[in-house]
Amino acid sequence: MSSTWEKIDKNKIKLSVEVDENRVEDALEQAYKKVVKQVEIPGFRKGKVPRKILENRFGPEVLYEDAIEILVPEAYQEALEEHEIEPVDQPEIDIDQMEKGQPLKFNATVEVKPEVELGTYKGLEVEKEKVEVTEEDVENELKQMQEQHAEYEDVEDGEAENGDRLVIDFEGYVDGEPIEGGQAENHNIELGSNQFIPGFEEQLVGSKPGEEKEVKVTFPEDYQNEELKGKEATFNVKVKEIKKKNLLPIDDEFAKDVSDFDTLEEFKNDIRNRLEEEAERAAEQQVEEQVVTKALENAEVEIPQPMIDQEVDNMLKEFEQNLSYQGLNLDTYYKLANTDEDAMKEQFKGSAETRVKRNLVLEAIKDEEGITATEEEIDEEINKIAEQAQQEADKIKEFLEMQGRMSQLKNEIAIRKSVDLLKDEAKVTVVEKSNDSEEETQGNTE
């Protein structure tokens, strides 16, 4: 087999492939064995017609289609590997010559992975928020835990107040018609939590156990269901139970109950350390996002549409998987959100293009710097996967090799190292954390 290629557009090439007549003959023989099973000719049992008679009766072309289906995929893949071409879409195949006793000649036109023109990616100037955990942060964390470990007691005669937890049945109506999905029984709601439509919870303040109330609300203009935006609704609500929240005092006993520490002071120190670690990770993540974003902005690449379309499909699959964790599927979501697959794909396009460009630019940096994954790093990554999957590392490695995913794993490790390079080479200025603006910490740079 021989093949050549030429560039016919920025991200499109044409492969010209010639397969020798011996391989063509082998493919024709395979095609004959398939076709003969379907042919009936008087004087011969079905499937027993000699090839020469078959070709004389129907012409040698009767085998060409099946032979081409055998030869072209094989030869196309061999040509890609020979010239180290990375296609990003299915090829357009044009058969130039297919004759018995002659080589097969065909052209394959396909869009390929684009070339990236890297800009500046070292010495990028970025900012990092100063990591600082205050006493107020620690106290807020304790209050959240206090809320989580609150105890509730039934209210027999009193009225519901903000902070109380109610068990209710409700039915919702718009223009006298039931709202789809607007009914529930034994639903838990905490007054003042703003979980429901604005105005709903407020009208239940002062209610008593066993009381039935009519609650009137207006759906917000930005409500996710298009059919309910701005609509007035009535909910028939029955208050079945009222439970009053009792907060445990934050003291040494509280620390013992909710942690492994004996004193509140020890517990607070642990919280402070954890918050500092979380804040440091968040600050580092911001630095990473900044350097990658700037590297992307400085690079130039023309992304083929098939790559964006493929990433959109990947994002839709990821979204579908996340829905499944909540017991939903795409069809149900489309109905609830009054949308469809085309609208979702359109919504994903911008993010998909950014994701594709990110991968292309980071791969280009990896190649430019000669970054690879070491055997130690590969083993470490496999051990992490094995630990998460509660499997033996050898079995995970064997599985990855069987699936042909080892090269993908190596590439992912190398890409992460490329991001680390951007961070290590960046000029980082530490700034004070502020809601309105960030003031530079004088003389404090990394």
UniProtKB/Swiss-Prot annotation:
GO terms for cellular component: cytoplasm. GO terms for molecular function: peptidyl-prolyl cis-trans isomerase activity; protein folding chaperone; ribosome binding. One of its GO terms (biological process) is 'de novo' cotranslational protein folding. It is an enzyme of class 5 (isomerase). It comes from the Bacteria. Its main location: cytoplasm. Its EC number is 5.2.1.8. It is found in: Cytoplasm. Residues 163-248 form the PPIase FKBP-type domain. It catalyses: [protein]-peptidylproline (omega=180) = [protein]-peptidylproline (omega=0). Keywords: Cell cycle, Cell division, Chaperone, Cytoplasm, Isomerase, Rotamase. Involved in protein export. Acts as a chaperone by maintaining the newly synthesized protein in an open conformation. Functions as a peptidyl-prolyl cis-trans isomerase. Belongs to the FKBP-type PPIase family. Tig subfamily. Consists of 3 domains; the N-terminus binds the ribosome, the middle domain has PPIase activity, while the C-terminus has intrinsic chaperone activity on its own. This is Trigger factor.
